[in-house]
A protein has these predicted regions:
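Juxtamembrane "anchor/assembly" segments of surface/extracellular structural proteins
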Residues: 14-83, 126-128, 210-282
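Extracytoplasmic/secreted envelope proteins and their assembly/folding machinery
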Residues: 105, 145-152, 181-185, 244-248
């Protein structure tokens, strides 16, 4: 695992005017090299539409939630007429200097009539397909992994990473007219398990975490815009950080918190000045 430090260039004469976000950050691999990152960029796609300006974004991802969600909001100067169908594919990317990373993949969560102006488009990740897939069967001599693989296949999904732990075979498990999400909860209950499951990057995880190749460091006065504790959790505010995912580890250097922590939630959204801010919870 490689450790990285994300540096902000704090140029105080520019801070109030906003160009801080055009000088945004440095990405430094310890004792190896520093990569300068300028000019934050966005790209939001819903169905056949692509938006790179005139929109505000909000992306929510939490390991305590079954699904990630996002919203593409249109500014007062930009009210397009959209024609979108529920389950049209959707992607939101954030990044710098032409290098963008997916922060959301999923689908449009409802229908949008082309005859009306839209204020926003709501999106849900692949769990939307699981919510609309009904399981109605009795399963014999099976394991949790076999059942979950079947549920995913019924929803038309094949990318998954399931726990490699060995569980005893259950002789019979009836599931009657439950969504695939409810069916997974029934499987967990039948085996007495309390394990997380979610999608990340289009891959379904059950009692597993997405691979992490880099650990990023956040430091007071360098790349932490604000750090506060509320509701029993810490909230760290920084600039657009598309490379931070929930269940990943980050390293903190701050008088209040120091050391490595696991991210429980990530929210990226447009602030009142029109810039993307990422809020990391742990």
């Amino acid at each position: 695992m490689v450790f990285f430090t994300l540096f902000l260039l704090f140029v105080f004469p520019f801070l109030q005017a906003g160009p801080l976000d055009n000088w945004v950050s440095f990405l430094k691999e310890a004792a190896v090299e520093t990569k300068e990152l300028y000019y934050p960029q966005i790209s939001a796609q819903a169905g056949s539409y692509t938006f790179e300006e005139g929109v505000e974004l909000e992306i929510y991802s939490s390991k305590s939630s079954y699904y990630d969600w996002a919203k593409i909001r249109f500014t007062s100067q930009f009210r397009p007429k959209l024609s979108l169908k529920k389950k049209d594919p959707a992607t939101i990317q954030l990044g710098y200097d032409g290098t963008l990373e997916d922060v959301f993949t999923g689908f449009v969560s409802g229908n949008y009539d082309g005859g009306t102006y839209a204020n926003e488009v709501a999106l849900k990740d692949e769990m939307l397909l699981m919510e609309e897939t009904i399981i109605n069967d009795t399963f014999l001599d099976t394991t949790p992994q076999e059942l979950i693989s079947y549920f995913l296949a019924q929803a038309g999904l094949s990318k998954m990473k399931l726990s490699s732990k060995t569980y005893p075979t259950r002789k019979m498990l009836p599931i009657r007219r439950q969504t695939a999400v409810q069916a997974i909860n029934a499987v967990n209950a039948a085996w007495g398990l309390r394990v997380p499951f979610f999608f990340s990057g289009g891959v379904f995880y059950w009692d597993e975490k997405p691979e992490q190749k880099k650990v990023y460091t956040f430091e007071r006065g360098v790349n932490i815009l604000n750090l506060r504790r509320a509701g029993g959790v810490w909230e760290l505010e920084t600039v657009s950080a598309p490379f931070i995912k929930h269940s990943h580890k980050i390293n903190l250097i701050h008088p209040q918190v120091s050391g490595e922590v696991e991210v429980s939630k990530v929210v990226s959204k447009t602030n009142d000045s029109g810039f993307i801010r990422t809020y990391i919870y742990f």
